A protein has these predicted regions:
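Acidic, low-complexity intrinsically disordered regions
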Residues: 6-7, 11-243
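Positively charged n-region of N-terminal signal peptides that target proteins for export
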Residues: 1-4
Length: 243
């Protein structure tokens, strides 16, 4: 009798685990994320001169498209950086985000990339300590120059922060870089090569960035794992037109 009961218990355990596993696999198809936090860290140092309108237009267009996606709650944090740091939006609901203009985005100064990333990670952590964790956090870092002005954060410190958040909270980090070794730079920051892309720093390349990011964000919001091919169009653009 004990053997029979034991066998029934094992069978029920296997069936229960199988159902739970199936639900996890199917999550992307049937259970879209309810709470996503988008975090943009945008370079506005002097090397971005001439691309102001394209950056503003690309960013605004991307957010407008995301506003039309009626998938769960989305908040936006946007940081503009050069050798100074500006927190433009801090965890603002996406439907309350006003279009960015040349009053906010204008180029100047040098590139304090490490400070921008480090400060923003700490800001998001502080936000979540007050309001609770979002179901998913997606960082998007865009820069067209080498780090040359950070004073508060070092490379090893930022790398540790990124790796901790990826490991503990499953944060996602995307890195888009121009005029640098984007893949190598991302790797030194603790960001996988599959999540980094080299782009061409001109009008077409800038517009392409935001078009591709829009699709990547849609994929993340759907609850699916972001495929390594998310950056294919950016890489093809560089391949066809050069860096």
């Amino acid at each position: 009798m004990k053997r029979i009961l034991s066998g029934i218990f094992i069978l029920l355990s296997v069936l229960t685990f199988s159902k739970v596993s199936d639900k996890k696999v199917q999550r992307g198809k049937n259970n879209k994320l309810k709470d996503v936090e988008l975090v943009f860290i945008l370079d506005r140092s002097g090397s971005m001169q001439g691309l102001e309108s394209d950056t503003i237009g690309g960013y605004n267009s991307m957010l407008l498209k995301q506003k039309k996606e009626k998938t769960g709650k989305v908040s936006v944090t946007t940081v503009l950086f050069d050798d100074q740091y500006e927190l433009l939006y801090n965890q603002v609901p996406i439907d309350k985000i006003a279009p960015m203009t040349e009053k906010e985005y204008y180029v100047r100064g040098s590139t304090a990339l490490l400070d921008a990333i480090g400060k923003t990670i700490m800001q998001i952590k502080a936000n979540q300590e007050k309001k609770g964790n979002s179901e998913k956090v997606l960082f998007v870092i865009i820069t067209d120059g080498m780090e040359n002005a950070s004073r508060e954060y070092r490379l090893d410190t930022v790398k540790k922060l990124i790796e901790e958040r990826k490991e503990k909270d499953k944060w996602e980090f995307l890195f888009l870089g121009a005029n640098i070794d984007a893949i190598g730079t991302a790797g030194r920051l603790g960001i996988d090569s599959s999540r980094a892309a080299q782009y061409k720093s001109d009008k077409q390349g800038t517009v392409k960035n935001y078009e591709v990011l829009n699709e990547a964000i849609k994929e993340v919001r759907s609850g699916n794992e972001l495929k390594d091919s998310w950056k294919k169009e950016i890489e093809e653009d560089v391949k066809n037109r050069g860096k």
